[in-house]
Structures are given as C-alpha cells and as structure tokens.
Amino acid sequence: MASYHIETYGCTANRGESREIERRLRDAGHHRVPGPESADVAILNTCTVVETTERRMLRRARELERETADLVVTGCMALAQGDAFREAGVDARVCGWDEVPAAVGNGECPTTTPDTEPVLDGVVGILPIARGCMSDCSYCITKHATGKIDSPPIAENVRKAEALVHAGARELRITGQDTGVYGWEQGERKLAELLDRVCAIPGDFRVRVGMANPKGVHGIRDELAEVFAANEELYDFLHAPVQSGSDAVLGDMRRQHNVDEFREVVDAFDERLDGWTLATDFIVGFPTETEADHEASMALLGEVRPEKVNVTRFSKRPGTDAADMKGLGGTVKKERSRAMTDLKMAIMDEVYGDMVGERREVLVVEPGTGDSVKCRDGAYRQIVVRGAGERGIAPGDFLDVEVTSHETVYAFGEPV
C-alpha cells in the first residue's frame, strides 16, 4: 500500500473531489502523510480560473516533483490544459479526479468519466448536483475541463442528500459549475423542485446553494425565491455572479444575461426575504471595458450592495475567444480592481457593523483558530465564537448568540 500527500486548490467542488479521492484511497488501504517529502505519491488537485492561478499550479507542480517520488496532477487545469505540465517539463501523470485512486494503486491513469459523488467533511456535506454548464463565456477556460451540463435525476440527488444527513451532515452545500441551470439539458428547470425536496428530508440541518448564474436564475426567480422563503433549512444566500454592470461588456463576455435581468433576480429575493445575503462576482479590466463601463459596474455594486463580492482582474486564458482580444494595460486593471475592492470592503464593513448588538441563531460549522469556532447565521454570514472548548461548543451545534463586535468580513458573537 502507498503513502500519499494531497493538496487542493480552487472551489468547493474541488475540495469535495479531494475528500472523495481520500476516502477511496483509505478504503483501498493507502494512508496519508503530512508532507510530500515522506510520501510515495503526491497528488495536486488544480484550479485554472485565471492566469496567476495557472502559474501557481505549474510552480507548485515543479516543487512537488522535486519533493516526492511520484506526482499525480488532477483537477480543472489537468483536464483543460494537461499538456501545459509536460511543456513545462513536469514529470507527472495527469488524470481526471475519478482516476486518481487507480493511478496511486497501479501507477496508471485509466480513462473514466468523473461522477458526482457526495462527500462528508466534518459536519459539512458537499453535494455536487450536476457537472458542467450551459454557458459559453468568451473568457472561461473551466468549461474546457467540465464540459456541458449533465444533471442526474432529482431522486438521485435527494438520495445522496439523505445519505449525507444520516451520516451526520448539518450543512449541505449544493455545488456545481452553475446550479441555476440544473436540468436544462433535459428541457426542464429543476433547481427549485430539487431544493424543496432536499429541505423535506427529516433532520436538523441547513442548505447552502452554490453559484447560480443570473441566466439560469432569472427564468425561475419568483419560484426560487418562494422556495427560499418557505424553507428555513435554506440559508437566505444567493451567489449570482453578474461580472459587469455594462450590457456591452456582458455581450462581449457572452454572459447571456443583461444588467436589468440581474436586478430583477435581486428584486425577487428582496420582495420575499428580509436580511438575505447576495454574493456576486465582477471581472474588472475585460479587454473591451471602457472607463464608462467600469463606472457602470461601480454604480451597480453601490446600488445592489452585495455582502460578498469576488473581484477578479481579467486574465487571458488559453483556448478562449477573449484571449485573442487586445487587452488593457496592467495599471488600468490594477486601478479599477483597487477602486472596486475599496467599495466592496466599505459595504461589508457596514453590513457587519450593523449586526453588533443583535441576537441570532447560528450553526457551528467548523473549528477556527485557537479555541474558536466558525458559525453561520441564517443568511450565511460568518460569526466567530471564542472559547468554544471550555464551553463544550463543537461543530454541528446550534447556538443563540449576541453579536459583540466585528471585523470587515465577519463578526464575533457570545452565546446567550
């Protein structure tokens, strides 16, 4: 049997896939070691969303190659840009994640199709409801790795969710490249029905819905918002990445939604949910983005005031149409990124500041630093409780807390 070391980069789906790799390796008798230098094989689960990440993956692969006897590379970069490792002189076996356990066992990467297995990580159950997406964004390399959407039946996903709850999951994380288009390849829009049925599973748990593009959510916005309002199991949290406040830029990105449609999604949730959390993403410095386009994005950010915002500077990804566009200068992108980041931080600071003095029920999700634990309230805002060990507080517990203070992106709470 082999010893292994595994490192994971990227999204929740990647982390879930790494947990499943580890489970299968343990079942096969392999054991994990703390560092690559003592491992028979190192496993690198990669991300490739932007150019800086790609460079980081190649650099880390070279380091691991020197530190361990054998290297297996998996994840999105392995699937979308597998040749990049060979071209960089990295001696590694490149596999889909579902192929890694066999590669560790017999030294070969078989050809299989990755599945969507659920994974339990502490009290968090990670449930990929589909793989792939329906979009064709001009800048995105991830689809080269994940392909077109493939949605398992609702009943199958509900069975997986039930298994996670029965195994001890207190938080279910519904994941996918785009959860909003679940079922679209079958001519149906199934996300709302799936969530309703998952919430009907007996047990005391919470459900977080992963990224759902405005394109998919817009057509079911009222139905989806009603499901959120009707089910207390659902965190009042929606991650809908708008990417730009300019319709012209959205068209060049091939995002398949416009700014008003994004606003209509936000309005539908505003009408039905008090104090819900909107998360979104913006790409700054897209090749065709003018100063006016950037100002439109800033205005939209200030208008909808999302509590979580991912701001990413555009970077060219190989094999995408946007890679052939004449880009903006690095200084321009940096200035626009800084301006948007400053605004988002001001919004978040205000949100968490307004929570001070309020009482909220939270779910303890995972250990924090020292003797603290990380908790989530009903809108998925993070509240840290200190001194958890001496109070007998552990992941999986539900607590009533009073918010006592805050940092920019989280609050502190005391049990009451």
Label the model's feature ranges:
Residues 120-123, 133-135, 234, 244, ...:
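Short flexible coil/turn linkers enriched for glycine and charged/polar residues
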Residues 203, 221-222, 229, 305-306, ...:
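Conserved N-terminal phosphate-binding loop of PLP-dependent enzymes in the Aspartate aminotransferase
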